[in-house]
Amino acid sequence: MAQSQNIRIRLKAFDYRVLDTSTQEIVNTAKRTGASVRGPIPLPNKIEKFTVLRGPHVDKKSRDQFEIRTHKRLLDIVDPTPQTVDALMKLDLAAGVDVEIKLQS
């Protein structure tokens, strides 16, 4: 029995709206070229919190808190055609979206 190939795409962004539009572009491109898509699967958000002193001196109890949320999505493209790979290579995604692509057998 022949092994099927999968393309696993992992997307990260600080803004979930930009991430969702980029994910939708990838899904539409893959479906248009004849590949089946599993996902998008939302992965857990990473929340980094930073606490800093508000003033330069004296008030230790006066502090500000900041956080950075990193949103993640996972896509699996099952049995991609050569047209799918070409279309994904030419796809221009929004700035601020980090893309990791792995080819699995």
Swiss-Prot record:
Q: Which GO terms describe its molecular function?
A: structural constituent of ribosome; tRNA binding
Q: Which NCBIfam families match?
A: PRK00596.1, rpsJ_bact
The record's similarity note reads: Belongs to the universal ribosomal protein uS10 family.
Keywords in UniProt for this one? Answer: Ribonucleoprotein, Ribosomal protein
The record's annotation in PANTHER family points to: 30S RIBOSOMAL PROTEIN S10 FAMILY MEMBER
Gene symbol of the encoding locus:
rpsJ
**What Gene Ontology cellular component terms go with this record?**
ribonucleoprotein complex; ribosome
Q: Which HAMAP family match?
A: Ribosomal_uS10
Which GO terms fall under biological process for this protein? Answer: translation
* Annotated InterPro entries: Ribosomal_uS10, Ribosomal_uS10_dom, Ribosomal_uS10_dom_sf
Query: One Pfam family from the UniProt entry?
Result: Ribosomal_S10
Instruction: Please identify the protein, giving its name as recorded.
Output: Small ribosomal subunit protein uS10
Q: How does it assemble?
A: Part of the 30S ribosomal subunit.
State the protein's purpose: Involved in the binding of tRNA to the ribosomes.
Keyword Ribonucleoprotein tagged: yes
